[in-house]
A protein has these predicted regions:
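ATP/Mg2+ or Mg2+-diphosphate-binding catalytic cores
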Residues: 259-305
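Active-site acidic catalytic loop and adjacent metal/ATP-binding pocket
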Residues: 1-4, 10-13, 158-206
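ATP-dependent phospho-/nucleotidyl transfer catalytic cores
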Residues: 77-176, 188, 282-285, 294-305
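Active-site activation/catalytic loop segments of kinase-like enzymes and analogous catalytic loops
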Residues: 38, 200, 206-243, 259-279
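All-alpha amphipathic helical-bundle segments outside canonical DNA-binding/catalytic cores
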Residues: 243-259, 290
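Conserved ATP-binding subdomain of kinase catalytic cores across diverse folds
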Residues: 2-128, 206-207, 222, 244, ...
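Secondary-structure capping and boundary motifs in well-ordered enzyme cores
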Residues: 62, 89, 171, 175-176, ...
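Generic, well-ordered alpha-helical scaffold segments in large soluble proteins
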Residues: 43, 100-103, 160, 213-216, ...
Length: 305
């Protein structure tokens, strides 16, 4: 399904399954392709977060074969996860999350979307069993490239992954799940951000997206100096958009808990997708930044909801 309008731009973007069989099988098991197609079909049009327009989408959920035809947002520029960003760019990116999170905050009807749910007990149990093994594999693969603070954080976190997988009773909404610079497009003509790659969207704690972006996108000095203001501004905008009963103290605690989300993603993705030179550099950088973030926030007491 898609937009039947004749007002097509000069170019469009076609998105297809990965050619690598390991990545493709991982996406099938995780329902990643289904999530992305359904997000564009069902949710993108009703949310104020900026995304490419859908022209056509279809998927065979049994095989994982899919196609998405999306508007080309050129000349927008893709962010660079390895290079990071300035505090001003981070503020734009965090502000854009309000348009994703606020409209369906604690909306029970989200549970009617099975492809968006991640509350399956069997799935959580599988992840709780799998992730410590992937962490061991990550350390073995990268050896001395895994910094001491990453080892310290990972050894503290992954044995408690089952606690982290538990969802809180409230403060849940639609989350992106991989909200980082590589998945954002920036328009030089104005202060606009567009969000792409919705293969990890889910129902989850909003602050995981915020902490994940801040922890990955800013260097340590900028993060430490600006993260309090970024969280304050996000919380104020969230309240301004109509979210009630979510105070600043709770927001900050959820942000601390969310700092672990990036380490989980860095390790899991590194071990479950096709290995590339840039991928190795990116995942090691992510692991380093996210581990330092969690340790800076003393987040070991915030693993459980």
């Amino acid at each position: 399904c898609g937009d039947d309008s004749d007002d097509l731009g000069s170019t469009v973007i076609a998105k297809l399954p990965a050619s690598d069989p390991v990545s493709r099988n991982t996406a099938l098991v995780m329902r990643s392709y289904e999530k992305e197609v359904r997000f564009y079909e069902v949710l993108a049009g009703e949310l104020p977060v900026r995304t490419p327009g859908l022209r056509y989408g279809d998927i065979d959920v049994e095989s994982g074969s899919f196609v998405l035809i999306l508007d080309d947002l050129a000349p927008a520029n893709q962010g660079d996860q390895l290079a990071g960003c300035s505090p001003d760019v981070a503020a734009l990116a965090v502000a854009e999350l309000v348009g994703l999170h606020a409209p369906r905050w604690d909306d029970p009807t989200l549970l009617d979307l099975p492809w968006l749910r991640n509350d399956d007990p069997d799935g959580r149990a599988m992840m709780a069993m799998l992730m410590p093994m992937l962490w061991d594999g990550f350390r073995d693969r990268y050896g001395d490239a895994v910094e001491d603070h990453v080892r310290m954080a990972g050894d503290a976190f992954f044995p408690r992954i089952a606690e982290f997988m538990e969802l809180p009773d409230d403060g849940r909404t639609i989350i992106h799940g991989d909200y980082r610079l590589d998945n954002l497009l920036f328009d030089d003509a104005g202060p606009t951000v567009a969000v792409v790659d919705w293969q990890t969207c889910a129902i989850g704690p909003a602050m995981h997206d915020v902490a994940y972006f801040v922890g990955a996108g800013l260097d340590e000095h900028d993060r430490r100096e600006h993260e309090g203001r970024l969280v304050d501004d996000y919380h104020g905008a969230l309240v301004g958009a109509g979210v009630a009963g979510y105070d600043r103290e709770r927001c900050w605690r959820d942000y601390r808990r969310g700092s672990w989300a990036g380490l989980l993603m860095a390790v899991g993705a590194a071990m479950m997708v096709e290995r590339t030179e840039r991928g190795d550099a990116m995942f090691l950088t992510m692991a380093s930044r996210h581990a330092r973030h969690a340790l800076d926030l003393d987040a070991t007491d915030a693993v459980a909801p």
